[in-house]
Every structure is written in C-alpha cells, then in structure tokens.
Amino acid sequence: PDHVVEGVVIPFGIFKDHMLQKMPGQEYSYWAYLQSIFSDEKKMLEDGIDPKDVECMTLQDLNFFRSQMEEIPLKDEFVKNLDNYFQKIFGRSIGNIPVFLRSDTNMEDLPQFTGAGLNLTLFNVLDRSKILDGIKKVWASPYTERSYQWRQQYLNNAEDVYPSILIIPSVNVDKSGVIITKGVSRGDEGDISISFSKGVGGAVEGQSAESYVMYQNGTSELISPGRETKFRTIPATGGSTFQYASLNRPTLTKEDLEALNEMAKKIVTQMDKVTGEQSAYDIELGIKDGKIWLFQVRPFVENSDANTSNYLKSLDPEFKEIYV
C-alpha cells in the first residue's frame, strides 16, 4: 500500500447510466443506438453481404457513435459526486491537481486478454474542463477501429463492453518501465524481465528501453542498453515536456535492480495468494527519488496470434530510427 497512490474509480455502472440517456434530437438512447449497430452488422452477415463491406459500414457507424459519445452530457449528480471524491481522496478540487485518467474495460478481466493499450489513457490533465471532457473521450475510446477489430477476434458479444476509469494523481517519476515476472527472452519461468527508461511512460510506449534479466540466483544480465536520448516529464501545471539526456550512465542503478527484483517477488507472492494459482504478471511502475511507485499489475498473457497479425501491424506507423 505504501507504494500505490490513492485513486478515484468511475465504475462501469456510471458509464452505462449515462449511455441510457437519449441521443440529441432522437427518441432512442446511446445504448440502444450502439446495440442497433451490432444487430445490423449480424443481420447483414446473415444476409450474405460481403464481410469487408459489412465491416466498413460498421466502422462508419462506430465513428459517428464515438463522436457523439465524446459530447455526451455528464449528469449533474455524477459531477457533484466526483467533485466530492476529489476533495476527499486528493484533498483538492477538480482542476487543482494533475491526474491520469486510465481506462479499463470488463473485457480486460478475461483470462486471454492481450489487448493492453487498446483504449485511451490521458496523462497529467489539470484543467477541470479537460478532465471532464477526458472522461467522455475515455468512454468513447473502445469504439475505435483498432479496439473494435481486436474484440471481433475474441468476443461473440462485442457490443457488451463497459469502460471504467481510474483517476490517480500524477507522479513525475525519474524513471519508469515494466516488469514481466518471467524470462521473456529465454522463457525461464523463474527469471524476471525488467525494462526501464528515463521519465514517465518508460518502456510502455515502445521505447528502446534499458532491459535486464534477473536470474533466480540474484544475478542480473543486461540484455540491451537504453537508446532514448529524450524522455517525457509531467510538470505540476499539466501536460508534458521533453528533456534530453546523455547515455553515459545506466538508467537503473544496482540498488534499483535489487529493489525492483524484491518488489516483483512480493507482488507475485501476494497475487498468487489472491488468485489461488501461480502466474506471471505484467507490472507497470516508476521510481521517484529512489522510491518505487506501483501503477498497474495484470496477468501476463503471451499472444502469438497478435504478434503475427497483419491487420494489427498495418495499424502501426513505421518509424525510422537513427543512432549516432
């Protein structure tokens, strides 16, 4: 608990409650319109219409629906309660503390979920209006093309996806990254893989991060050095800035590695007790002034199909990297 920030959760039910409002100028609700999109899709497929054409029409409808969701009115009672919880949990009102809005959906509870990052997360938002607008944008994010396409591969009822939002105060960490509690490169179940970069959002955003394997005997091996010469910081005024750093020193010290290794072992022990089974975990964390801050723990699921999906690859831009 000492390594986790306090937070406010906007649960699935708040999203559904807002979805039951009528759409502007219509007699039907947002929820009814969403259901009609997928029922029309099923009917067109049953009628023998080319699946590619059906998908194109569905994506057009979802694009319109997403634009409507981004403008959905927030209920006065909800905003009032949110104000109260900000004051109670954070000690400040909305607009006076920068926060992260982290998305979550009920499909992420599925054991085979491998779609981390499909939905929107907003970081270091300070302005009150941007926080409230951000809630709408996070609610709308499961209806992007990428998120829809992922759900179609795994869910029979892709329309029944409910987003929740975790609001946590921003921590301007010195370095951040991920831990996988198994040896990713060699597949050894007893090893721990660590990838870190300077600043916030390290390793999670696909950076060329500094990566290690921590072996069961306590020794470590550098798999790849960090190659990022700039890193993101999040000032108290909101938003983000970039700073530049030399590569003459490692991102993680020996003490960092030992502390991260110990933290990972404690998390595995605790999570295995909670779940009642032994698993590998994907852990997001950061380090600020030598203290580890834990941001997220989820089961680590390897998805070989996703790694070879031409569709998913086609949605990712190609970047050219030049190293000097």
State each model region's role:
Residues 1-2, 6, 10-19, 28-32, ...:
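Conserved divalent-metal-coordinating catalytic cores
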Residues 165-168, 281:
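Two-metal-ion RNase H-like nuclease active-site motif
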Residues 1-166, 175, 252, 268-272:
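N-terminal beta-alpha lobe that positions the nucleotide/phosphoryl donor
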